[in-house]
Structures are given as C-alpha cells and as structure tokens.
Regions:
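N-terminal subdomain of nucleotide-sugar transferases
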Residues: 1-27, 32
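Short His-centered aromatic/hydrophobic patch
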Residues: 69-75
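Nucleotide-activated donor-binding/catalytic signature segment of Leloir-type glycosyltransferases, i.e.
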Residues: 212, 222-252
Length: 363
C-alpha cells in the first residue's frame, strides 16, 4: 500500500502540485517533487485524530482543489476536510476497505466513502463492492494500480541465475513460484494440499518456490504459517517439492522471476477478505511469466486468459492443476505475456489517475 501511494503521488506530481500527509517515516521516502507532512502517532486512533487535525491545518493554509484519501481508512479525513474548505474529496478504494466486518467502520466509514465526490477503485470487482457499499455509479472510476516495468522481459544473466538456483537448492526441474504474504486469502496451504500433488504426479521434478513471510500480530496467521504448510506438504507427499525463500530483496525477486516457469496465484474466495486486484500477476507478466489463478475478486482484471495465463473457477483444484501442467509443458509466448503488462505501466496509470481527478493529462 505504501509503495502504491508513493507512485500515485509521484505520477500526479507531473500534472499538479501535490502534498502528502503520511505516517511516521514517510518523509524520508517521498518522491523528489512531492512535499510531505507526517502524522507521527503509531497507534491507529491517535494517528487518525492527528492526521485529521494536520490535514485540516494544511488544507486551510494551502487551499487544495482536491483532497484524496489513499484508502478507505483515511476517507473520513479527506471527505470532512474537503467539505470544510470547499474542495473535492476523492477516495482510492482497494476492496478490503469496502468489506471490513466491523460495526463502527460500516456505520461511520462506509457512508463517508460514499459521500466522496469521486471514488477510484482498483478493479471491476472492487467497483461492484463500492456499489454495494452505497457509492453512486456516476462517482466511480476504475484505475488499476501500476507496475514498475523492467527494461525488458529477458530473464537476466544465465550464470547468475544458475548460481541462484544452486544457492537455494532449486534443482534443474520446472519452477512454480508464489509471491506474497502467507495470509489465508492467498491460499498457499490449500494449493499445496489440493493442487500441487496433481502437478507433481505429472511433472515429478518440479519445485514450488514460495516467496514471502507470514504476517505478524494477525489472528489467522498461524493457519498459513511456514510450519503449517510444511505439515500439509508432508501429508501430501510433496515436501521435497517445496522451497521457502521468505522475505527477499528486489534484486533476489528479479532472480526468482528470471528462473520461474509459472506463477501460481491460488487466491481463495473470502467474502469479507477480497483480493482487490492481483498486482503480483502483473509483476510476473512484466517478466514474461504466465499466471494460473482462481477467478476471484479483482484477479480477472490482472490475468488475460490465454495471453498472460489461465483463470480457473474457484475451488476447482483439478482444473488448476491441469492448467498449470499445460502451461509447464506448452508455455505461452513470453513476449505476448509481457505486452499485456505494458497496459499497467505507471506512465499510463498516472494519466488515467489525472483524468479521473479532472486534471490535464496532456504532456
């Protein structure tokens, strides 16, 4: 989320003067063209109060035309302060911020989201969630998040990639990758239990490379911990086909994409925990790596059927395995996959955001 808002600020600064109010530490990470103010409280309640007061003070002095909330959580601040000074209020909603199962949030936050002059959503699925939350259709705009595109989709130096394989004991076989936090929504445990055995039966020397760590301080984290996934893998007789890399650097992630044969994205259908978009599928596509995913939430906006991957009906584990096997045996064209990702370049997304805000998007 922080990286997304960083890019939004950077892109909008090409079309307008931009000032950002962010959490503690954000000033050191700000784009050069963007002024940053901070709300330094670390606890949620004090942070929101401090952010509201600072936003109001800045808005009275600076008189912006638009006040934009980077998520539903800060929507009340944007909407209320905008009304105080006569500015337009804009909210960028991501999915989960429209479905949170919390009485106060649904009673206070969602009505204020619906009162924004414009609500930008990250996918077609999130648009439907916004409509159910009471947002008028004429106030909705879909702008998918952008992705940092590599200079080309070539995998990288072959010697470096071979060394990376050896270092992490990835073997010579086909590599499936999963990139993201080990949350219940991402469905890695279910994939290892229900899908991977079918793939291994047909492609016995393949390896699932899992990038990402388990979230801390989350009630459901244990259900998708490394230990629980390993236990399921042993029960399914696929423990030898899994490697955990944990949290890695951007350079190491580029290596992972460089050696990957397929990206798997087995997101689960969870009504109060939707997948708003599926940025990792675009990041994989930018490197010429196809994705197999369940057709849930905003994922269909991030995977082009038979161009950048395959979409499978939720819960169809045998269909998921069959699609993965087919793409491992007969890969899609890497250049066509990468061409799909070009639609999500930050340059294009910046223009779409500017147009959604009513700014002049002409260079």
């Amino acid at each position: 989320m922080e990286r997304l808002n960083w890019h939004i600020a950077q892109e909008l600064s090409r079309y307008a003067q931009v000032r950002v109010l962010g959490p503690k530490g954000s000033a050191s990470l700000a784009p050069e063209e963007v002024a940053i103010d901070e709300a330094t409280s670390e606890k949620m309640g004090p942070f929101l109060l401090q952010a509201f007061l600072r936003c109001l003070r800045i808005a009275r002095r600076w008189r912006p035309d638009i006040i934009m909330a980077g998520s539903g959580l800060t929507a009340p601040i944007a909407v209320i302060v905008a009304r105080f000074i006569g500015a337009r209020a804009v909210v960028y909603a991501h999915g989960l911020d429209l479905t949170v199962d919390h009485a106060v949030y649904r009673r206070v936050w969602l009505p204020l989201v619906a009162r924004a002059d414009t609500v930008i959503v990250n996918s077609s699925a999130t648009r439907e969630l916004a409509l159910r939350a009471g947002v008028r259709s004429d106030r909705l705009r879909i702008v998918h998040p952008g992705v940092e595109l590599p200079a080309n989709s070539e995998p990288g130096d072959l010697q470096d990639l071979a060394e990376f394989r050896r270092k992490h004991d990835l073997g010579p076989g086909k590599l499936l990758i999963s990139v993201g936090r080990l949350t219940p929504r991402k469905g890695i445990l279910e994939f290892v239990r229900d899908v991977l055995p079918g793939i291994v039966a047909r492609v016995p020397h393949c390896t699932l490379v899992i990038v990402g760590d388990a979230p801390v301080h989350a009630l459901a984290a244990a259900s998708q911990s490394v230990e629980s996934i390993q236990a399921v893998a042993r029960q399914a007789s696929v423990a030898a086909n899994i490697r955990f890399l944990g949290k890695i650097t951007d350079d190491e992630l580029s290596m992972v994409y460089g050696i990957a044969n397929l990206h798997v994205f087995p997101v689960q259908l969870r009504p109060n925990d939707p997948e708003g978009f599926g940025m990792v599928a675009i990041e994989a596509a930018a490197r010429g790596v196809a994705t197999v995913a369940y057709r849930v939430g905003g994922v269909p906006d991030a995977v082009a059927e038979n161009q950048s991957g395959r979409l499978i009906n939720p819960g169809d584990s045998s269909g998921f395995a069959s699609a993965a096997i087919a793409l491992l045996e007969r890969p899609l064209d890497a250049d066509a996959i990468a061409a799909f990702a070009q639609r999500f370049s930050w340059d294009r997304v910046g223009k779409q955001l500017a147009e959604a805000l009513g700014a002049d998007a002409q260079e």
